[in-house]
């Protein structure tokens, strides 16, 4: 990624190199919204100094599902040095993460409650009876009882 100044604006340009050494430059208007979103998230995940907390809302929007595995790998790696809070309604994305690291957020009596996934659901995933994607698509992820 490079930057070019045009008037009073600084615009990012993306350099893509082929195996033969040829380089091509693309401005943001030539790149899909999903690719730009993934690049932005990856830049934030690998930014130094590392922030103590990073929040990403619905990273799956509007991203090609094939790229979500790459994103989850990067998030898992970054979580070793930065606390990550990722919100998602995507069963496919949720399925790419460790059930022990996932929290369910609910509203009860006007209060927000954050809890681990219900033990029975975590055990079903651990025993390979169901995937998180299947659970989320059927009954939904349920919070552990207090």
Ranges and model annotations:
Residues 2-46, 59-66:
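Conserved ABC ATPase signature
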Residues 6, 19, 50, 99, ...:
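Short strand-connecting beta-turns/loops that link adjacent beta-strands
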Residues 24, 52-53:
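The start of beta-strands in P-loop NTPase/AAA+ ATPase cores
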Residues 33, 47, 95-99:
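Generic structural "secondary-structure junction" signal
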Residues 48-51, 74:
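Residue-level detector of alpha-helix boundary/anchor positions
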Residues 54-58:
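Catalytic Walker B motif of ABC-type/P-loop ATPase nucleotide-binding domains
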Residues 69-146:
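C-terminal lobe/lid and adjacent interdomain/linker elements of RecA-like ASCE P-loop ATPase modules
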């Amino acid at each position: 990624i490079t930057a070019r100044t045009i008037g009073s604006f600084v615009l990012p340009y993306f350099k893509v190199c082929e195996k033969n050494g040829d380089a091509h430059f693309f401005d943001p208007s030539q790149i899909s919204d999903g690719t730009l979103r993934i690049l932005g998230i990856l830049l934030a995940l690998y930014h130094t100094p590392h922030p103590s907390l990073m929040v990403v809302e619905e990273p799956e929007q509007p991203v090609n599902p094939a790229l979500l595995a790459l994103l989850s790998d990067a998030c898992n790696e970054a979580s070793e040095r930065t606390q990550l809070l990722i919100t998602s309604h995507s069963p496919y994305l949720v399925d790419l993460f460790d059930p022990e690291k996932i929290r369910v957020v609910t509203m009860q009596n006007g209060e927000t409650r954050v809890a681990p996934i219900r033990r029975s659901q975590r055990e079903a995933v651990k025993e390979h009876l169901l995937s998180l994607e299947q659970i989320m698509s059927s009954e939904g992820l349920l919070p552990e009882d207090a």
